[in-house]
Amino acid sequence: MSTILLVEDNPHIMKINSSCLSMEDYSVLEAADAAQCRYMLSNNDVDLVILDIMLPDGDGISLCREIKAKYDIPILFLSALSENDDIITALRAGGDDYLPKPYDIQVLIARVEARLRSVRKDKRYISFGRLRLDTCLLY
């Protein structure tokens, strides 16, 4: 079962997203701010972060950079900011996907599935410089 960390300061959005993702058989962790996000990441094995940009104790863009510097975890941004510049900034900061609010929950679930599929493919291989090993052949 994949573990998703939701970082969202709006309790209503958090509840809806958490419930819907749980119904899809994901393990869902919740963080209402950047500090809780850091704590959850340091104490749990997380497969995907769903990150809001506007947080009470910082911004999601800076937090994304911080996460990417320490962890190899895909980040899907959810934000009310929907201008092209906002999307470009988030993706250039290391975000792997961006979904503007409001959004259809089925689109969110489809994007989560796509991100996690890509993670599973990447984890199949180990790279050492130019050498790339298929871990399925090691067993």
Locate each region found by the language model.
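Short, Lys/Arg-enriched segments at the junction into DNA-binding effector domains
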Residues: 3, 113-139
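N-terminal/domain-start alpha-helical segments
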Residues: 1-119
